[in-house]
Regions:
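Transmembrane helical segments that form the transport core of multi-pass membrane transport proteins
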Residues: 102-216
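Small-residue-rich segments of transmembrane alpha-helices in multi-pass membrane proteins
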Residues: 17-29, 89-102, 146-161, 264-270
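Juxtamembrane and boundary regions of transmembrane helices in multi-pass small-molecule transporters
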Residues: 9, 48-92, 97, 231-281
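Structural signature of hydrophobic alpha-helical transmembrane segments
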Residues: 27, 53-65, 114-124, 156, ...
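Structural signal for the C-terminal ends of transmembrane alpha-helices
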Residues: 3-5, 71-76, 111, 127-135, ...
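Hydrophobic transmembrane alpha-helices that form the pore/transport pathway of multi-pass ion
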Residues: 1-27, 38, 204-222
């Protein structure tokens, strides 16, 4: 939003592209999404094993997302802009430290360091640095408390429903049998619908026992829960955070416009990425 406004262009196309890619580009690495971490924890796969299975579906999802966004937003991406002078960091030392921490996150994840440890160390380093140099920037308001409470409530609701037959019902909806293309698509679409109804994290946890009959079904479920939550504004944690940032940035998000774009794009994304998964079995 800041970059778009500095350039004097309409922020909506870039905001929509950000939330789409935050979801669809998260398939490639096991640390890119909490649902990916849940799958890796379930299967015990290494980073190499996961990437070996998901590289093609992830690249297909990324390419199709960019193509769809270009088509859906073509009228908004017309015109010229002047390139402004780059902004000067308020604190160069903090800026360089933050860049270094971000650059080290990827290699640390790939080398197999537990994600929780990487995240905690990175957060601690930056928190200490800000406490020393810009203490006023550290506020409890930076923590998205409403998001935390909402997500916990969704987990509790799904847990209660599981005790009252949710898993059996989801098994009927998602289907069973050999891993045909049809069953993988059914699993992916079930995950997408569930994600848009409740949120992709509780949706994945609820459907994981149903899809655990094979690694391919778990990956199809991951495709559904990562690519699917682009229709409702609560479909994923990324979407919830994005909406909160849009609100704080004075950008009004039209749920209708968001939902229409998602309703057009999600089925195409699910079919193409699931087909790529099926072809690389």
């Amino acid at each position: 939003l800041t970059a778009a406004r500095r350039l004097g262009v309409r922020p909506w196309p870039f905001a929509l592209a950000t939330v789409w890619l935050a979801n669809t580009a998260s398939l490639l690495l096991p640390v890119s999404n909490l649902t990916n971490l849940l799958l890796v924890d379930r299967t015990g796969w290494s980073v190499a094993t996961y990437v070996g299975r998901m590289w093609l579906p992830a690249l297909v999802a990324l390419g199709v997302s960019v193509l769809l966004l270009a088509l859906l937003l073509r009228r908004d991406l017309v015109g010229r802009y002047e390139h402004p002078d780059p902004p000067v960091p308020h604190d160069r030392a903090l800026f360089r430290l933050a860049v270094a921490v971000c650059l080290l996150l990827g290699p640390a994840f790939v080398l197999g360091v537990p994600p929780w440890l990487v995240g905690c160390v990175a957060a601690l380093v930056l928190a200490v640095a800000f406490a020393v140099r810009r203490r006023s920037e550290l506020r409890l308001g930076l923590v998205p408390w409403q998001l935390v409470v909402t997500t916990l409530a969704l987990f509790l609701v799904v847990g209660l429903l599981e005790q009252h037959g949710l898993t059996a019902w989801l098994t009927t909806v998602a289907g069973s049998g050999p891993d045909s293309l049809g069953l993988l698509l059914r699993t992916a679409f079930t995950g997408a619908v569930a994600s848009n109804l409740v949120n992709n994290l509780p949706a994945y946890l609820a459907l994981e026992p149903v899809a655990s009959s094979s690694p391919d079904r778990l990956l199809a479920l991951l495709i559904g829960t990562n690519l699917g939550p682009l229709i409702t504004l609560w479909g994923s944690l990324a979407t919830l955070l994005w909406r909160d940032r849009c609100r704080s940035g004075d950008l009004t998000v039209s749920w209708t416009r968001f939902a229409v774009a998602g309703a057009i794009g999600v089925p195409i994304l699910l079919v193409t990425s699931t087909l790529a998964l099926w072809l690389t079995r």
